[in-house]
Structure formats: structure tokens, C-alpha cells
Amino acid sequence: MTLFTHSIRHRITFLAVCIAACIFALSMLVSTLDSRDNALKAAQDNARLLAEREAARLEGELKRTFTSARTLAQALQGMKAAGTPPSREQIDHAMREMLQQTPDVLSYGSLWEPNALDGRDSEYAGRAPSHDKTGRYLPYWNRASGQIAVEPLVDYDKPGANDWYVVPQKTLQDIFTDPYPYKVAGREVLVATVSTPVMVADKFMGVVALDYPLEGLQKSLSEVRPFGSGYAALVSNGGFYASHPNDKLLGKKADTLSPQALE
């Protein structure tokens, strides 16, 4: 074998080794990238499953709470449709009892169209605490002071502040408002309102509503720690934070989240 032949063979062998090394390195790189992608996908899948599980749990809790407003609305519309509307005092008693039995609810309230309840608004004009000067029945049973008490609903004719009334009035559907701050026992808490229409013969009569403080929900979600260092947040249908580890973001627009995160 000549020196030239030996040199060529050596170079071919060296080149083959280099190619093999490059192929091995590329294989390792592809394998690493695949592993990283698989790990990322697995993490995303796990996070989505956790979110779906928590969402289902919260949905169940909220449905149980909100059913009370719908149940009262259905009872009132049933009696009204039968021609035996309950007295205002009976409705007051029912809402007070409901509030006592649902400690996680801040308040129950009801507002009827003029003379829609019993045609006696003029008799009740200015008779506090369940009426204002119009005589419309508009009690607001609440525990904002720390004790259960009733006062007349306000701002029901103020645009923006009366969505809990005008939206069910127009859509004939329930509404769950975006969170907003409200003072309870001297301190400000985040609250959402659920309002359901009272319908008789397909005609809007009024609403039954409840205010739900989001503190309990906030505390429950604060215990959810995906992968030990993550956090869970709840965004309302209107795109506002109903729950977030950063209290400063509560009730604020969730405009930093990606569209995928809001799906």
C-alpha cells in the first residue's frame, strides 16, 4: 500500500467519523428538541386539564348559589300567573330567610316594573325601607353592615349602574355582571351580581337578584398552584379579573392575556 493510498483511506475514515459524529450530534439535538417539545406539550395539557377541573368545580359552586335567585323568581312568577301574587311582606320574609341560609351571599334584592306586582304602588309611595317615593317594590336585603338589614335599591334608573335590571329587561335572560368594588362592613370587597327576570305570560315583570362577594372564590383559587410555582386566575365574560394572586389586578381588564389564554 502506497503512502498516498494510506493517506486517502485515512482521510475517508476520518471524514466518515466526522459525518457519523455530526449525524449523532444532530440526532441528539433533534431528540433534545423533541423531548423539549413533548415536555412543553405535556405541561400545557396538564395545565389545561387542571384549569378545566377547577372551572367545573367553580361552576358547580356558583350554580348552587345562583339557583336560589332563579328559584325565588320562578316561585313569584308562578304565584303571579295563578292570580295570587304574594304580598310584599311575604317576599320580604322569603328574602330575609334565604339570606340567613346562604352565608356566602351578600344580598338578595328585587325590583318590579311600575304596578306590576300588585297594582298598589301608590299606597306604598315613600314607605321605607322596601320602597322609595315611587312606591315600586324594590327591597335590598343585605349583610353589608355585618347584620342582615333591608333598604331600598338605588341607581336602578342610572345607565351603567343598572345593567342588573335593564339587561334582563331587554334580553329576558339571566345576567352575571362583571366584578365591581362594594363596601361590606366598612371595607371594600369585589362583588358580582346575578339577576334573573320574572316573567308572566311572556311579559317582563321585574327581577330577582343577588350579590355574590368574590373573596371566597379568590381564596379557593389562591390554593391552586400549577407545578408548584404557577397560579390560577379567573376572568369574567367581560374580560375582567374576578380572581388573581395580585390584588391590584382584581376587577381590572385582563388585557395582558393572550387570546389563547382566554379560550
Predicted regions and their residues:
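Non-catalytic regulatory/interaction regions at protein termini and inter-domain linkers
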Residues: 1-9, 38-41, 123, 133
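Short loop/turn microsegments at loop-to-beta-strand junctions
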Residues: 106, 193-194, 229-231
